[in-house]
């Protein structure tokens, strides 16, 4: 195994360009190349990987991504060629996308991020995030088996997706509390962004009793900046009011390719 990000890899060095979305195959195949290489890309199954030359670029291409898109690629190219490849893909129709946009897609897809829905201040494991089926307890060499089972026997919460009911409200941040209709804290926001319709959409770690779809909760957005108790504030002072949220299905309906 080699670290292809390390300069010691020399000509084999690689950096990653993510090309995601319904038009990504069409854009990728606009690059000049042999029919065999294009066929390898066009026939790539999910999580498949191939090594081809397209547009004169030596590429390792995987059918992967972290945006929830069914059509998605990651292009591993030498760092000296990355900028040229990026600009050529844009000229062929790709739209540049920053990390915030990518994160909004991740959250909408219900995918966990290390430090938010995995590990982080709440010490969450794969099952907390809804990915417990990836933990292979049948493997005899899994040294964390006992600890995982013990944790699962005690776990009372799980990650959910939620959406604020109104637009134009203060965005929740990691660590903001979720409360039930009686004002009891039942969860903690782990991630939040804005969806394609202008609503704040996020993920939170909540008590299992409140994880059911369409459950109504409220979030104290910006709780770290909350003002004093309203009974202790003078006229004209402001304090944070909770915004109502709706719990969504753990993952969105799977889109066809």
PLM regions with names:
Residues 1-257:
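Conserved, structured C-terminal
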């Amino acid at each position: 195994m080699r670290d292809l990000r390390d300069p010691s890899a020399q000509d084999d060095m690689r950096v990653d360009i993510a090309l995601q979305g319904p038009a990504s195959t069409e854009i990728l195949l606009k690059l000049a190349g042999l029919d065999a290489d294009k066929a390898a890309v066009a026939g790539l199954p999910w999580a498949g990987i191939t090594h081809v030359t397209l547009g004169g670029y030596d590429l390792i291409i995987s059918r992967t991504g972290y945006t929830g898109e069914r059509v998605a690629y990651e292009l591993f190219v030498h760092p000296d060629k990355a900028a040229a490849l990026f600009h050529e893909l844009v000229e062929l129709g790709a739209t540049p996308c920053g990390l915030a946009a990518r994160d909004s897609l991740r959250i909408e897809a219900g995918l966990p991020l290390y430090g938010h829905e995995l590990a982080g201040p709440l010490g969450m494991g794969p099952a907390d995030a809804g990915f417990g089926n990836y933990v292979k307890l049948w493997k005899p060499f899994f040294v964390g088996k006992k600890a995982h089972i013990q944790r699962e026997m005690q776990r009372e919460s799980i990650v959910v997706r939620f959406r604020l009911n109104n637009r134009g409200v203060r965005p929740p941040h990691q660590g903001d509390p979720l409360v039930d209709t009686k004002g009891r804290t039942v969860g903690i926001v782990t991630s939040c962004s804005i969806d394609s319709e202008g609503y704040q959409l996020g993920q939170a770690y909540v008590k299992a009793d409140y994880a059911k779809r369409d459950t109504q909760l409220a979030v104290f957005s910006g709780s770290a900046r909350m003002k004093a108790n309203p009974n202790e504030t003078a006229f004209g002072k402001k304090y944070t009011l909770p915004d109502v949220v709706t719990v969504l299905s753990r993952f969105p309906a799977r889109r066809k390719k």
